Amino acid sequence: MVIVTDSNFLDAAGTLRKGLLYCDFVAIDFEFLGLDVSAISLHDTVESRYQILRDNVIKYRPCQLGLTLFKQKSNRAYKADTYSVPLFQRFGDNDTSISLPSMRFLVKNKFNLNQVFMDGVEFCTRKEFKKFERALLAGTAASYLSREVKSQIELLKVMVHEKCYQSTSYHITHRTDEPMQKIPLKMKPNSSVSLRMPRNLSSVEKYMIIYELTKAFPQFLFTCDEKQQNLHVKNISDDYLKEKDNLERARARCSESVKGVSAILQVVHMTGKLVVGHNSLLDAMYMYHYFFSHLPANYQMFKDKFNALFPRIMDTKLLAQALRFELPGVGDSLENLGDYFGSDKSDKTVPPELRGFIEPWMNPLEDESENVYHNAGFDSYVTGEVFLKLAHIYINRRNNFKNEILDFDRIYQYLEAPILNRLPFQLMDVGCCYLTGDDSKGFRPDVITIVRRDRVAIEEDEFRYLEKALGTLMATYQFDIEWSKNKKELFLATNSPGSYAFLCEKFSNDSSLAPLDELDSGKKWTFEQRQTAWRSFKNRGVGIGINAKRIRAQNQATKIQRAMEI
């Protein structure tokens, strides 16, 4: 894994761009400064869930980006380069929040928060970058800098005068911009002077200082040494540069440092590479909001705009769910999948060329200390590795192929129809977020409608008691309860047939409350009948609106009645 920080980002950017041009696909993962799931409910519609996730993205910034570039070689085996990039935006909107539970979780998993805040790589949206570019051209970009850094720039201008020209006391004591315009400073050919740079500067601050000095002294070339502690000054004529080219080069370097890692994701967009993630809807939203443009106000617009930027994205969680019978007990979490495919247990399920660790491609294996889950770099590698292995199992078994390695183009062709541009929703009655079409239907049990047997309104005290009692009763089983606007109905949402049947049976035996479908039909069903006929009505557009409750109850009763007759 290569750790890319603010200190070495501009040096590593060239290798990253080259890798993106030649790789077959890129796996991406983010870590965030927080994630608030308290507002998420099983009752959410796609629009309400999008708004909850959007609020999270805006509230908590990303703190780490993981990129792994995968390349299939001539022998069909794969190579991969992994990059771990701490993220820290110094010059954008400073309004952000930090979740202490999330921070404790990251630190527990050996996450280096100090690296984020001290050496995180800059990033920005397109709008933020254009604003900076305008300021740069207008000569007002120094407004992005602190007062302390501005003072250091003025001090360095004076030091350039002292080092490069024997000025009179008049020139030393007056404003430095006056002698810059009137007195041509020159140095002896092939000679240089060194100035001490301020400590603890970000790359943006460093290149802004160089740019401001170049504007003041375009006849000089300013460069920093490897340790970035000394500023070297020499004549541009020694490098056969013109003043205009010298200033343009300093300006371009300044712009590149401000754009930061956003420029790398721009390359992903421009090359149209396949992007692979795991449970990646939130990652997609983070990538859009912080590196391209602010998230749209509604869900459909997000789908359209994100797909325009990244027309090819696949998610390993959906592949794992499709293979749940072929890989029993493995599950669909990244850790479980990574552990399974990293062990000998998986050797018989994947081609020999994919067994074990995928070797580095263009970069040596620099640092294994961060090869832990919840490091975005390592997670991106595991995501890509899991994707390749799941894809081969899926394609080979669905088509009765031998356990053989496939060309990447064939993998893409086989997965295009069932997997491409589909991102999983968690705890929702929707199959997935389909970026290029209508979202697929989910497989969750119907919402249970509970009413009083005498059909009168449910009092608030009774609702609060039920809410607390059911929370204790259901323990770790997922469920959510809502109260209708007319106070006469309770809506219970579950995520499994067993919990659905359990709640139906509980209220079927209750003396004061009952499932609406039983009261309407005059029939009562057993736990087993409920468990095998739990899906009766599904309409994505209706959701759980008031007008649909009666239809749902009637359809549910009809479905269960048919099951009894069989």
Swiss-Prot record:
Gene3D superfamilies: Ribonuclease H-like superfamily/Ribonuclease H. GO terms for biological process: mRNA catabolic process; nuclear-transcribed mRNA poly(A) tail shortening; piRNA processing; priRNA 3'-end processing; reproductive process; RNA surveillance; siRNA 3'-end processing. GO terms for cellular component: cytoplasm; endoplasmic reticulum; nucleus; P granule. Its EC number is 3.1.13.-. GO terms for molecular function: 3'-5'-RNA exonuclease activity; cation binding; metal ion binding; RNA binding. InterPro entries: CAF1_poly(A)_ribonucleases, RNase_CAF1, RNaseH-like_sf, RNaseH_sf. It is found in: Cytoplasm. Keywords: Cytoplasm, Exonuclease, Hydrolase, Magnesium, Metal-binding, Nuclease, RNA-mediated gene silencing. Expressed in germline cells. The record marks K317 as: Interaction with poly(A). The keyword Signal does not apply. A divalent metal cation binds at D29, E31, D283, D379. The keyword Hydrolase applies. Disruption phenotype: Slight changes of mRNA bulk poly(A) tail lengths. Animals display a reduced brood size at elevated temperature of 25 degrees Celsius compared to wild-type. Accumulation of untrimmed piRNAs with 3' extensions, which are stable and able to co-localize with the piwi protein prg-1. However, while the expression levels of piRNAs remain unchanged, the piwi-dependent mRNA silencing is reduced, as is the production of piwi-dependent secondary small interfering RNAs (siRNAs), also called 22G-RNAs, on mRNA targets. 5'-end processing and methylation of 3'-ends are unaffected. Its cofactor is a divalent metal cation. Involved in transcriptome surveillance. Required for piwi-interacting RNAs (piRNAs) 3'-end trimming, which is important for both fertility and piRNA-directed gene silencing. Has 3' to 5' exonuclease activity in vitro. Belongs to the CAF1 family. This is 3'-5' exoribonuclease parn-1. It comes from Caenorhabditis elegans.
